[in-house]
């Protein structure tokens, strides 16, 4: 029917995997989301009036070129497996834009200016955990819990408790994106022209529909 169709909801199998089992065959059961690669590059080009002004526009925020994001769940956790083209750069203390996952939930209430409720990995700790923070409309963040993480070369795995995101075994639908080294995460345009964002710009992927 070209006018409309009945909504199709998908079946998501419960799969449990250790956060450090980045090469487990269980990841073959995940939902896989693919990003464009090769566009995460330094920029140094003449401005539109450059022939007259000699002004160059430069950007060197390119760092981790995100390739794929795989997502699974069980009754207690969401699991993310993120791959990059080259080995992921090491986290540096205080870097709030290192390999972030931004999440929007169905009934999450107020969001930040980009429409997300949660940000993961704005802080990374030496005990193998990272922050899960609630986003506020004024651009502030408040810690609500922690996720587990494991990094091996170009693979980053994240294990997030559903209850930290106010989700459950029966309610796990999310919209999400992964981004790295965004120059101004309060400005949606920065998700187009700095660092890397998967998917690009203001777009999100959906899991659990």
Which ranges hold each PLM region?
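Internal alpha/beta core interface subdomains
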Residues: 14-19, 29, 207
């Amino acid at each position: 029917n070209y006018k409309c169709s009945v909504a199709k909801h998908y079946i998501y199998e419960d799969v449990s995997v250790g956060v450090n089992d980045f090469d487990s065959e269980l990841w073959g059961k995940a939902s896989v989301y693919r990003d464009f690669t090769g566009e995460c590059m330094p920029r140094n080009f003449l401005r539109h009036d450059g022939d007259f002004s000699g002004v160059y526009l430069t950007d060197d925020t390119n760092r981790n070129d995100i390739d794929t994001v795989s997502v699974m769940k069980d009754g207690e956790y969401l699991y993310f497996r993120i791959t990059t083209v080259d080995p992921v750069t090491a986290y540096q203390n205080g870097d709030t834009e290192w390999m972030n996952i931004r999440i929007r939930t169905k009934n999450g209430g107020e969001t930040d200016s980009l429409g997300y409720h949660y940000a993961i990995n704005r802080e990374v700790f030496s005990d193998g955990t990272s922050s899960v923070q609630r986003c506020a409309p004024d651009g502030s963040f408040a810690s609500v819990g922690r996720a587990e993480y494991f990094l091996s070369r170009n693979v980053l795995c994240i294990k997030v408790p559903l209850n930290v995101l106010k989700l459950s075994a029966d309610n796990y639908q999310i919209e999400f994106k992964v981004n790295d080294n965004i120059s101004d995460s309060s400005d949606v345009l920065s998700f187009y022209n700095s660092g890397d964002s998967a998917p690009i710009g203001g777009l999100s992927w959906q899991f659990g529909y």
